[in-house]
Every structure is written in C-alpha cells, then in structure tokens.
C-alpha cells in the first residue's frame, strides 16, 4: 500500500499487555501543574531501564479537575498492578508532593485499586488527617508550604504498551519533520508517547552479544551498519529511521493513534513506514499497519 509516495509496509506492530493508571495533578497555575507533570514523568521512557513508562496525557482546564484548578493528566504504565502502585508512590512522593501548590488525584474510577495516598500519608509523621468527599477518601499531609492533598487509592486497569511505527526517510531532516508531524496528531485521549517529545532514535532489539544487556541497538535499522550487520531492513535510499512508541489505556486508542501517525508521516522523502515486532512471539497484540490505513482500526 502507498500513501502519497510512501510505502506502508505489510507488517505489524507487536504490542504488550500492561497495566495503566492516571494521575490528575493540579496546582495554583499552569506553570506549577506542568512542572509537576514533567518531573513525575522524568526517566520513564521504557520499562526495560526505567521500571515504568509515563507521560503527560493532556493539560486540563479548571472545569475538568476535582478542585477547580489548572492541571495535567498523567498516564503511567507498568507490567503489574503492584509495580504501578510502587512507581506511583515513589514518583508522587518525590516529584508531586515536593512541587509548590500541587494536589494529586486518582483519574481512573474502574479497575483494581492500589493504595498510594494511604501510604504517602505517613510522611506527615502523625499530623496527617483524612478527608471524605462523598465516598472518596483523601489525605491532607502537612508540608512547610501548607498541605498536600492526595487520594488514598488510585485505579489501575489493563492497558496496552509498545505500539509503534518506524519512519524510514531519505535524510535526517525530512525524517524528523515527518516524525514531529506524526507525534503531534498521535497524542489523543488515553494515550502517551513516552520518549522525548514522542520520538526515538535509538530503537532496540531484545538481547545482545553482551550477556548483561537485555536489549541492544536495532542493527537491522541502522543506516551506518548497512553492509556490516548480518542483515538490513533498509531500502538502499534510506538514510535515517525514527520510531514512535505508543502506550494506551485501551487497544483501540493505541490503534487510532498509530493510524493518525501513519497518515501524518507519509510524504515525499519518506520511503517507508514500518513497525517493530518480534515475529509474533512475545507480544499479545499484533496491530497490522495496512488494516489501520484501510480504516479497520
């Protein structure tokens, strides 16, 4: 299949079962809400090296937050509810509670529950107090600035991680411009792109010649290794490859994000759009690119 002059490779992205949670972080103004959002999602690009994957889902107007203040919604993904709970506790404690004027609320009503505020409250050293709002229990933790308000527990639900597209271009500038255009339209509700501004240049493959490494450079897609690596997946005129990885709360949201990205990236100078997979042996989801483009998302 071809869009404009770009070939959509007849292949699939291999995605994985994960667990996801949503934080709603509010603050006195947008500046501090974003500061907390950026901090809590730092070093969270891949579960391989970061224990979780996280990103800002959206900026929220006061009408859309529990306390009527500006906010951000943040999605965080891991391999188990317990793992997600641990990462929430660590990151909220170090990156949200520390940020001036913030509060942190659960953004998922369904799924399983993990205790977060109910554990973080002990930072209050006995001075913490609970607060009931309807059937919602929150904790007021005294801090030097005033109080930090947080939900006792957060929802965790089954999710999908590792959706991806590979953008193969004739030169670095054209490829980056296509990836930027794709990333911009791929940010939809229920989805994050966990890498820097959504784009990955150092795609990986499982395993390595070095036993200590669980992953290593995806040599089949490295233009500089054409001719020296055992095999290449690159057409002769490809000089740059960039990847976009997608995590979502549902398979449907990941598929829709990928569909939008493929259409946005296709243009002159982009030779192919492909996807990373492991032969269907590791992931539980196989998302075929041609089906997405044909509208069967």
Predicted regions and their residues:
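Conserved mixed alpha/beta catalytic, RNA-binding, or beta-rich assembly cores of soluble enzyme
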Residues: 2-62, 81, 86, 90-241, ...
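Extended, highly charged
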Residues: 74-75
């Amino acid at each position: 299949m071809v869009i404009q002059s770009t070939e959509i490779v007849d292949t699939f992205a291999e995605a994985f079962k994960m667990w996801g949670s949503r934080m709603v972080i509010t603050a006195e103004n947008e500046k501090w809400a974003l500061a907390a959002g950026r901090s809590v999602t730092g070093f969270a690009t891949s579960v391989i090296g970061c224990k979780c994957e996280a990103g800002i889902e959206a900026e929220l107007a006061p009408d859309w937050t529990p306390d009527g203040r500006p906010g951000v919604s943040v999605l965080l993904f891991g391999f188990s509810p317990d793992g997600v709970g641990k990462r929430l506790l660590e990151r909220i404690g170090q990156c949200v509670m520390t940020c001036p004027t913030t509060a942190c609320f659960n953004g998922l009503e369904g799924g399983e529950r993990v205790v977060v505020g109910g554990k973080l409250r002990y930072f209050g050293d006995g001075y913490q107090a609970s607060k009931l709002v309807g059937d919602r229990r929150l904790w007021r933790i005294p801090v030097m600035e005033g109080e930090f308000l947080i939900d006792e527990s957060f929802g965790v639900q089954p999710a999908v991680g590792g959706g991806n597209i590979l953008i193969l271009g004739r030169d670095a500038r054209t490829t980056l411009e296509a990836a930027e255009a794709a990333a911009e339209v791929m940010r939809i509700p229920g989805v994050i792109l966990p890498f820097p501004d959504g784009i990955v240049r150092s795609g990986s493959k499982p395993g390595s010649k070095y036993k200590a490494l669980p992953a290593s450079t995806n040599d089949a897609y490295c233009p500089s290794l054409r001719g020296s690596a055992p095999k290449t997946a690159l057409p002769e005129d490809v000089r740059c490859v960039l990847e976009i990885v997608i995590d979502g709360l549902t398979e449907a949201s990941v598929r829709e994000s990928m569909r939008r990205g493929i259409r946005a990236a296709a243009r002159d100078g982009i030779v192919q759009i492909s996807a990373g997979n492991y032969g269907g042996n590791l992931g539980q989801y196989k998302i075929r690119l041609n089906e997405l483009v044909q509208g069967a998302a």
